[in-house]
Amino acid sequence: MKFEKPKKKIIDWYGSKVSVPFNCHIYPEKKVKIANRFNGEECTMPGYAVAVYDTIIGAERFEDWDTVRAGLDWFRCHFAKEYMVLLDLSLIHI
């Protein structure tokens, strides 16, 4: 299956312009609590960041590695702590 390269999207987030790494459905909630799928550790993020997280997980499932990489890079830059909790597999002890 061939995927398009992800394209950045600018959204209006409660009066602020925010850039997300690809076009995805943005959740309207200001804050969402989400848990690491392997160890249950939780963190709270804005809805747009959770939308990016969910897109990364879905892209992983479909082996769309360009989207996964774009999302991971964005998370490391904009939500470093949350990246470490939710997405940095080197810290997960299964």
Segments (PLM) and residue ranges:
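Acidic, low-complexity, intrinsically disordered interaction modules
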Residues: 37-76
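N-terminal acidic leader/helix
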Residues: 4-50
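Short coil/turn segments at secondary-structure boundaries
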Residues: 86-88
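Conserved small/polar residues in nucleotide/adenosyl-binding loops
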Residues: 92-94
